[in-house]
A protein has these predicted regions:
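Short, surface-exposed beta-strand/loop "edge" segments at domain boundaries and coil↔beta transitions
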Residues: 31-32, 70-76, 91-95, 177-179, ...
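Glycine-rich, often acidic-flanked micro-motifs
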Residues: 2-21, 120, 124-134, 148-321
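A short, compositionally biased micro-patch
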Residues: 69, 78, 146, 154-156
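Extreme N-terminal, non-catalytic leader segments
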Residues: 67-128
Length: 321
């Protein structure tokens, strides 16, 4: 970690993911001009319609520029495993890490031959069990709980996938787990935050150092998480029509190959790079997963007390392999 004295914050200088190393350098110099042949890959706006970010491919040799208006400019040389960051004044450390640990790592993994999935995962009974889903579906919370109840932490938020000899492997992710402060407290993850974690800020998550399971694991299941509203909320909404107790049970339903393929596409961690080579590799991998790996919808109560039942349901489901 490197301390930026002007901002009094700690920033990572090395990220390790999927057995690869990404070196990070921070600079105060003005970013160099974009090469003339740069290709704009993505442009996003915030909720107010203002420009939020832009991604460019600056060469065909694994060079990218990510410009985030609330963080800074990140020039990635994926082939050489290094990124140069020019940060904005008074930038939030959380904003910097969101870019580094999310889109920067996703581009880096793509150039290293991995397909990044927006998922968290554990190693359970020697196999990779992954959890995808919309923001707020509970991916990180579930992995945090499972990691303290018999499973081994594999990754949080970004799962590097690679196919080898017909087998899909889930590789270790970044050695960090990030939780919303209320979730961290309820799950008992307290007193272990990394230095520089600012859970008091609304935008910041509590960050916990975790050592991922060291070896890639064969992907046994990919669960699409869907939280059922808490009992109190359901009681209010179901008063007039009567509540169904079965609605609050853990439910696992396997998707057909077409549904699974579409769900995987929605869960990609990078939909910006659309070169023919990348799209061909992605489509082939997701089609193979949809045919050979069970992709299931997992519905469970939005209640931390239900997590033991979730683990039991997963263990029973894995016995069907």
């Amino acid at each position: 970690m490197k301390k930026d004295k002007s901002r009094n914050i700690l920033l990572p200088t090395i990220l390790r993911i999927a057995g690869e190393r990404l070196n990070i350098r921070y600079s105060r110099a003005t970013p160099p001009a974009l090469p003339k042949l740069s290709t704009l890959l993505r442009r996003t706006n915030d909720r107010g319609g203002r420009l939020a970010s832009r991604y460019w491919q600056t060469s065909s040799k694994g060079h990218y520029r990510l410009d985030w208006l609330d963080a800074g400019v990140f020039d990635l040389d994926a082939k050489r495993g290094k990124v140069t960051c020019v940060l904005n004044p008074d930038v939030s450390p959380g904003a910097v890490e969101e870019v580094l640990r999310g889109p920067v790592c996703a581009f880096f993994l793509l150039e290293r031959g991995f397909e990044p999935l927006h998922a968290s995962a554990v190693a359970l009974d020697g196999r990779c069990v992954a959890f995808a889903g919309a923001p707020g579906a509970g991916k990180s919370s579930l992995v945090a709980w499972l990691s303290r109840n018999g499973a081994k932490f594999l990754c949080d938020d970004i799962l590097p996938l690679r196919q080898n000899c017909g087998i899909v492997w889930g590789h270790p992710g970044l050695p960090q787990l990030r939780l919303e402060p209320p979730a961290a407290r309820k799950l008992g993850w307290r007193g272990r935050e990394e230095a520089g974690s600012s859970s008091s800020q609304l935008r910041e998550k509590s960050k916990f150092p975790v050592t991922p399971h060291g070896e890639p694991k064969r992907v046994a299941r990919i669960y699409l998480l869907e939280r059922i509203p808490s009992r109190k909320g359901r009681q209010r909404s179901n008063k007039s029509r009567g509540g169904n107790i079965q609605d609050r049970r853990v439910q696992i339903q396997r998707l057909g190959p077409r549904q699974a393929f579409r769900a995987l596409l929605k869960s990609t961690r990078n939909d910006s790079l659309d070169t023919p080579a990348r799209l061909r590799r992605q489509m082939n991998l997701f089609a193979h997963i949809a045919r050979t790996v069970p992709v299931c919808r997992l519905r469970y109560p939005h209640d931390y007390g239900a997590l033991p039942a979730v683990l039991e349901a997963i263990q029973q489901d894995l016995k069907l392999c």
